[in-house]
Amino acid sequence: MKDQIIRKIFNGLIYIHILHHGNEQCFYGSWMIEELKEHGYNISPGTLYPTLKSMVDEGYLLKEEKNVNGKIRKYYKNTDKGNELLNDLKENLKELVNEVL
């Protein structure tokens, strides 16, 4: 049960992390996997890419395809809606952290 709860919380935090980086700069999926790994998340492409697709479909991220050395690479960045969500999540997280700690 403990591991399931921790996993659910980490999964939610992944969305915040994606939006955080999408606000700062364009990123591509394999870079995000490595970035998340540096913070202790072990996320597979089979988990990340559907997450990114759903965030694009819901209007939180924009996707741009670029040709890099003959391969198409998908870059992501926040939409205005994504930035609004990020700001809301940061406020909620700040309130929770202040209360719990």
Set out the residue ranges of the language-model regions.
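Short, Lys/Arg-enriched, disordered terminal segments
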Residues: 1-6, 101
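Basic amphipathic alpha-helical segments that dock to polyanions
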Residues: 48-50, 55
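Amphipathic alpha-helical dimerization/coiled-coil segments
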Residues: 84-101
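Short secondary-structure boundary/capping segments
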Residues: 7, 53, 67-68
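N-terminal helix-turn-helix DNA-binding core of bacterial DNA-binding proteins
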Residues: 6-47
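Basic, amphipathic "hinge/linker" alpha-helix immediately C-terminal to the N-terminal HTH DNA-binding motif
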Residues: 72-89
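Beta-hairpin "wing" of winged helix-turn-helix
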Residues: 58-72, 77
